[in-house]
Amino acid sequence: MLTNNLTFVTHGTRKLGVRSTYRRILISQEHRFIFHRIPKAANSTIIKTLLAMDPMIDYGSAGYSDSKAKNKFYLHPWDLSIRDSVSARRNFYYFCFTRNPFDRTLSSYLDKFKEGDKRLLKYRKKTGSDEVPSFDEFVRYLEKGGLHEDIHWIPQTMIIPAPKKISFIGKVEKIENDLRAVTEKIFPGASYKGPVNHNPHSTGASGKREIYYSSDLIRRVARLFRKDLRLLGYGWHN
């Protein structure tokens, strides 16, 4: 692994390390694209759609039962020389998909702070509590330094390069149309039939806001993710 390849380094890389962040970047030299995956932002659906539409992949035999299928067909930054990485960064179609921070934060809590998850175990070790924290307690944990401890809830603008350096930023909330725009660009001529749904970690967070968010929590989460809200064009209602 090329740990000295700094081509794709972001603020998040410096916080979480190369391995944790670079493994989220998928590169296709054949189709000249870079997909920068943001956790808790429809990754499984997007990847499954790419695998299904890629004309160079026999999807029928590959399937998606193998959770490592994406690694068989697409590269990571450490698979490329520094020269090739720089060339790809400059010339390939670079895209990502973002999610409303209010939904992404709640989804991270619902998915990762459950019995048996290593993140809950880490939280318990830090706090000395044996209980599953409430959403309010989770947000308090983020406020006290936990915000930058895990890629599943670190601000999205810390994971990806500056928006002006990305070819296309799609939104999970508009995935039908935005994924069409991406596939038309990277797989010209291929038939787009909509997102291929695959949601092993779906929490339904967007439909549970009213259950978990108080006016105080809205204010606090907005403060934590103010840069995401501003640069990615999100708010409580959009």
Ranges and model annotations:
Residues M1-N238:
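Membrane-interface amphipathic segments in extracytoplasmic regions
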